Regions:
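Preference for extracellular/luminal or secreted protein segments
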Residues: 27-80, 116, 299, 308, ...
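Gram-positive cell-envelope targeting signals
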Residues: 1-29
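A charged helix-plus-loop insertion that forms the helical arch/lid used to bind
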Residues: 138-149, 195
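Structural recognition of the beta-strand scaffold that forms the well-ordered cores
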Residues: 48-53, 85-90, 118-123, 129-131, ...
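Flexible hinge/switch segments at interdomain interfaces of large molecular machines
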Residues: 132-136, 175-183, 224-230, 359, ...
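Short, well-ordered alpha-helical
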Residues: 32, 36-38, 42-130, 178-192, ...
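Short acidic, glycine-rich surface-loop motifs adjacent to enzyme active sites
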Residues: 53-57, 74-97, 174, 184, ...
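Second-shell residues forming the walls of enzyme active-site clefts
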Residues: 38-41, 62-67, 71-74, 96-115, ...
């Protein structure tokens, strides 16, 4: 369907650009977009509204799927023939700088063959626990930024993300998360949020968007109207937030309004029920019964509230449509039709595409939408509005004029994961470290030439980061010659299961761990709260129970010994260690995926979380601690009966 029409589109673009020479400003842009739109077929409009992924691929000659990291003839032909509006990358796709650069260029060349419309090349580069660039700068994450209390750090984070993505030709990031994390039991947002104060979240998001804009990268505020006050992950279920419009306007919606007023170009919808905003039900072709509409499928929420009342003029994109919040209730065709009628402009991952055979599913969706338009179920004017928003965004960001010659591999290699970006990352991570408890001025540690310090990570990929922090402290002269520092871990993670090196209940220690605990005079241990329900203290959980018992063992063996806990994930576990001498929160547990020491002779070129290293550096006194908790800590029910 693509090639002949793409030549018509090229003609329309040329005529539009000639006409624009006598025009200026918005008029020129509108003329070009209108001309493009008027020459598009109905099916092209539908596919322009699609953001597809090629996360993994199996060619006709392959025995199994593998990560799609290099263009092949099958995907090339698909992108040439379908006028997709966008392609989204995952970590599977963008592992190394040169490889990522080549893949981006190849996708755009396929999309623009016969003068087709260039793509929005997209990824979720949030920073922190959600980052995609395998060789990029991970950053400490949004909650760490919130803990610094300085919006300039959010702007710097936006600049780092923007500089690295733009150098690779990735023009859109589905970030920042502007959800207000006001539910400690939230399993999916947590560290991805700047915190629980809506005003602060708005200011931080605004600064990060400003940083992205300096490198012409499109930002996307998510997940509208808010995913912060949920206890269900919409990847696996359908959450519900039972709040009134007034309550939302006074809290969850505040950061979105700030972003809209600033000119945010894209907002992502959430697969969440908001019954007080919309109690409409529709008949589901999949479940064969009446079902409520989540935000992504709600006209009242996306059109009436977001576009009309709040004044959003940009592109509304869905969260991934293969998530259970949608897919468990609606089939793919019905879900896409409902989303379009709700006011969605860009459909993220309408179906999974991993081989040529999967294209039949996508064709069925396109056919279904085309039939719905022809039957009057969807007005073509709704598609025209959506495509106009997408093309206007591409025009405003210069994407319609994409040229491979505007990009340089040398620049990408010099930018992605650069020493300059890593230095800024380190500084921000250190500023975020929050000392919650510091009995008798335990911190910074007073290390002498006779000291014996034991650093205990949760997992192997964190161990190298603790070692790196200690080496930085030694280089700074804070660990004198003669002092001993040993590094171990208490979890043995395998693909099949997690096995403790030391039992969580403290009943059976391994001899090697016992020897280390008896040997040390100072214990620094990571507590990785991860996705635990914080309504109770999980002393029988490996990630928190084990470090609790490590601290307890050392304190009972010799009260003169020093114990320090690093809360490396959501900070709600900081009150679980009453016996510890000092407790700090670092807001990120990402390790080094190569399990190598970063920056040394065997340094890793992969993006690694800076948070744990920063915590170790603060413990030894390389940096002071200035962070503040950006969330309140609910009181635990102190029980082991979970």
């Amino acid at each position: 369907m693509g090639k002949r029409m793409k030549k018509v589109l090229a003609s329309a673009m040329s005529l539009s650009m000639v006409a624009s020479m006598a025009m200026s400003g918005v008029g020129a842009t509108t003329s070009r977009v209108d001309s493009l739109l008027s020459n598009m077929s109905l099916r092209q409009k539908i596919t322009q509204m699609m953001m597809v992924d090629f996360r993994q691929w199996k060619t006709a000659d392959d025995e199994a799927k593998s990560d799609f990291t290099k263009m092949n003839s099958e995907v090339q032909k698909i992108v040439e023939d379908y006028d997709f509006g966008s392609v989204i990358f995952f970590a599977n796709n963008i592992k190394e700088t040169e490889q990522s650069f080549d893949l981006t260029m190849d996708l755009q060349k396929a999309a623009t063959k016969d003068n087709g419309i260039p793509l929005l090349i997209t990824t979720d580069q949030e920073g922190g626990i959600v980052y995609r660039l395998g060789s990029g700068t991970a950053l400490p994450g949004n909650m760490a930024l919130g803990a610094t209390g300085d919006v300039n750090n959010a702007k710097i984070a936006g600049e780092i993300i923007g500089s690295e993505l733009s150098s690779l030709g990735i023009n859109t990031t589905l970030a920042p998360v502007v959800d207000v994390n006001n539910n400690a039991n939230n399993p999916v947002i947590g560290l991805r949020s700047y915190g629980e104060d809506a005003e602060m979240v708005g200011k931080m998001a605004s600064a990060e968007i400003e940083g992205l804009a300096e490198y012409n990268v499109i930002g996307c505020a998510k997940h509208f109207p808010g995913h912060g006050d949920t206890a269900t992950d919409s990847h696996y279920g359908l959450p519900m937030v039972d709040k009134s419009k007034e309550e939302l306007l006074n809290n969850e919606l505040k950061p979105y309004q700030v972003a809209i007023n600033q000119g945010i170009e894209m907002i992502m919808s959430a697969h969440i029920l908001y019954p007080q905003l919309d109690d409409t039900t529709v008949y589901s072709e999949q479940t064969k019964k009446q079902e409520k509409l989540p935000s992504t499928l709600s006209h009242k929420i996306l059109t009436n509230l977001l576009k009309e009342e709040m004044g959003f003029k940009g592109v509304v994109v869905t969260d991934a449509m293969n998530m259970a919040g949608i897919a468990a209730t609606y089939d793919e065709v019905q879900a896409v039709k409902l989303a379009i009628n709700a006011g969605v402009d860009l459909i993220c991952m309408p179906t999974n595409i991993t081989c040529l055979e999967d294209m039949s599913k996508l064709d069925a969706i396109i056919d279904g939408v085309e039939k719905a338009v022809n039957d009057g179920e969807i007005q073509e004017s709704r598609l025209d509005d959506a495509v106009t928003r997408i093309l206007t965004l591409k025009e405003n960001k210069g994407i319609l004029d994409w040229k491979e010659s505007n990009y340089s591999l040398e620049k990408a290699l010099a930018t992605v994961g650069s020493d300059e970006n890593k230095a800024k990352e380190r500084e921000i991570a250190a500023k975020a470290v929050t000392v919650v408890k510091n009995e008798n001025n335990t911190l910074p540690l007073n290390v002498t030439k006779k000291s014996k310090v034991l650093l205990v990570a949760a997992e192997n990929n964190q161990r190298s980061l603790m070692k790196y922090g200690a080496e930085r402290a030694k280089n700074a002269g804070l660990i004198p010659d003669g002092a001993e520092v040993k590094v171990t871990r208490y979890m043995d993670r395998t693909l099949a299961s997690d096995a403790t090196v030391i039992n969580a209940d403290g009943s059976t220690y391994t001899s090697s761990m016992t020897d280390l605990l008896d040997w040390c005079d100072t214990l620094v241990v990571v507590s990785d709260n991860s996705g635990l329900n914080v309504a109770k203290a999980h002393y029988n959980n490996n990630y928190t129970g084990t470090p609790y018992n490590l601290v307890d063992y050392v304190e009972k063996a010799d009260a003169s010994k020093t114990t320090v806990v690093i809360s490396a994930n959501k900070p709600y576990d900081v009150q679980m260690y009453p016996n510890a001498d000092a407790i700090m929160a670092v807001y990120g547990s990402k390790g080094d995926p190569t399990e190598q020491l970063i920056g040394g002779a065997t340094g890793s070129t992969s993006a690694s979380g800076p948070n744990i290293t920063a915590g170790v550096e603060v413990a030894f006194g390389v940096f002071g601690a200035s962070g503040k908790l950006p969330v309140r800590i609910p009181k635990y029910v102190l029980t082991t009966n979970v």
